[in-house]
Regions:
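Cyclophilin-like peptidyl-prolyl cis-trans isomerases
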Residues: 1-143
Length: 143
């Protein structure tokens, strides 16, 4: 999959507001520490890519994950079950590209409680649209 470089240049002042059925989540985006990831996240949000997507993974004390386009048409019951008949598996969708990793190039990028990070596979350059929020410090994910 081709690596995408966002056009959006973060100012370091970006705040994401994720509206959920439980209320809004506000997150300060670290545009100075992860400009590619923040630029990509902002562009996807501005295009409406995240509209209607559901959080598809919740592991108490670890993470809550969203941003998979495969959840767009899923019902809450299907998301809770972790699957929907006839639909691509949750957690496998992407925007059609991936972005370059930034976690090894900046020591400020750490998984503190409440941190927002991009989900990826074992390939460090495989992040696209999926993200997770840390539910407690997750320093085992820092490398």
């Amino acid at each position: 999959m081709a690596l995408y470089t966002p056009e959006y240049q973060p100012t370091g002042e970006e705040i994401a507001v994720i509206n959920t059925s439980k209320g809004p989540i506000r997150v300060q985006l670290a545009g100075n520490d992860a400009p590619i990831h923040v630029g990509n996240f902002v562009e996807l949000a501005q295009k409406g890519f995240y509209d209607g997507l559901k959080f598809h993974r919740y592991v108490p004390g670890f993470v809550i994950q969203g941003g998979c386009p495969n959840t767009r048409e899923a019902t809450p019951e299907q998301v809770a079950a972790g699957r929907a008949p006839g639909m691509a598996p949750f957690g496998t969708g992407n925007p059609g590209y991936s972005i370059k990793e930034e976690f090894t190039t900046n020591p400020n990028n750490s998984h503190e409680d409440g941190a927002l990070a991009m989900a990826r596979s074992m390939d460090p350059n495989s992040a696209g649209s999926q993200f997770y929020l840390c539910l407690g410090p997750q320093h085992n994910l820092d490398s």
